């Protein structure tokens, strides 16, 4: 069985005081969570302080980005080994905001995937289509092409102990999510494509949904067979909203003890 995975992506939000208060609240709220996995991705400046508060908690640490190099003259970047030193478990790569604002392409993202696997961190590969691609019916082919770049470079084995997050670009931050039924179709197409290479990997890989996830709509996403959790943006910055999402996952029929 696949455990539901809930990740809060805080993006470029918060300051020392607000983030500290949010972390303390979440740690105290999630002390008895045992049937789903939870992680938070604070801004890089606050990874260390977050790590300290997460010690002995039920919450794991996720990075929002990683460089393709382990060391060298790369001003402003952070390596996978540096993240490892901070007890980071997951790292987001391929997020649409990185693709759009930093011009990261599939080949560059595949290098990030490689370096994370080399160090032993779990990559969360974000895939998804823009509004034009969605309207043209290219959703599934766009996602498959983004995944196929990883397979071409690293082989299907790279997806062992990895995560894929389907995030329709047009839904992120818009307040309009994909319908759970349509999201399920995309998730199934991704799992089926991976199964065409290796059914065991396909059965075990976690595929999250992201894009305007809220406490009000999250249950219907969890109800879908191939949706194994959610990548939460704005709602994860509100302790009550994020707690409701995590508690819904904890109580869902898909969840089970470690």
UniProtKB/Swiss-Prot annotation:
Annotated GO biological process: gluconeogenesis; glyceraldehyde-3-phosphate biosynthetic process; glycerol catabolic process; glycolytic process
Keywords: Cytoplasm, Gluconeogenesis, Glycolysis, Isomerase
Entry binding sites for substrate: 9-11, 173, 212
Active-site residues from the entry: 95, 167
Xref: Gene3D superfamilies: Aldolase class I (3.20.20.70)
Gene Ontology molecular function: any one: triose-phosphate isomerase activity
Compartment list: Cytoplasm
GO cellular component, one term: cytosol
Pathway: Carbohydrate biosynthesis; gluconeogenesis; Carbohydrate degradation; glycolysis; D-glyceraldehyde 3-phosphate from glycerone phosphate: step 1/1
InterPro entries: Aldolase_TIM, TIM_sf, TrioseP_Isoase_bac/euk, Triosephosphate_isomerase, Triosephosphate_isomerase_AS
EC number, as in UniProt: 5.3.1.1
Reaction(s) this enzyme catalyzes, per UniProt: D-glyceraldehyde 3-phosphate = dihydroxyacetone phosphate
Functional description taken from the UniProt entry: Involved in the gluconeogenesis. Catalyzes stereospecifically the conversion of dihydroxyacetone phosphate (DHAP) to D-glyceraldehyde-3-phosphate (G3P).
Family under the similarity heading: Belongs to the triosephosphate isomerase family.
Quaternary organization: Homodimer.
PANTHER family assigned to the protein according to its UniProt record, in alphabetical order: TRIOSEPHOSPHATE ISOMERASE (PTHR21139:SF42)
Protein name: Triosephosphate isomerase
Source species of the chain: Blochmanniella pennsylvanica (strain BPEN)
Gene: tpiA
């Amino acid at each position: 069985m696949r455990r539901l995975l809930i990740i809060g992506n805080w993006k470029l939000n918060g300051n020392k005081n607000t983030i500290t208060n949010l972390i303390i609240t979440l740690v105290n709220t999630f002390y008895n969570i045992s049937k789903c996995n939870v992680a938070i991705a604070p801004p890089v400046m606050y990874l260390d302080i977050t790590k300290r508060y997460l010690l002995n908690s039920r919450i794991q640490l996720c990075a929002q980005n990683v460089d393709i190099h382990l060391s060298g003259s790369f001003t402003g970047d952070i390596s996978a080994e540096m993240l490892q030193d901070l007890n980071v478990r997951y790292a987001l790569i391929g997020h649409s905001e990185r693709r759009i604002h930093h011009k990261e392409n599939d080949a560059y993202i595949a290098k990030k995937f490689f370096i994370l696997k080399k160090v032993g961190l779990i990559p969360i590969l974000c895939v998804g289509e823009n509004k034009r691609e969605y309207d043209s019916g290219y959703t599934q082919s766009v996602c498959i092409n983004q995944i196929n770049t990883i397979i071409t470079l690293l082989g299907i084995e790279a997806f062992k102990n990895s995560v894929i997050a389907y995030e329709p670009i047009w839904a992120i931050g818009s307040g309009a999510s994909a319908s759970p039924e349509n999201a399920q179709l995309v998730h199934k197409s991704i799992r089926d494509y991976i199964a065409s290479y290796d059914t065991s990997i396909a059965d075990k890989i976690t595929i999250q949904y992201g894009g305007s996830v809220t406490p009000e709509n999250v249950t219907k996403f969890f109800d879908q067979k191939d949706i194994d959790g959610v990548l939460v943006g704005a709602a994860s910055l509100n302790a009550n909203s994020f707690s409701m999402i995590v508690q819904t996952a904890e109580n869902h029929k898909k969840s089970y003890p470690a």
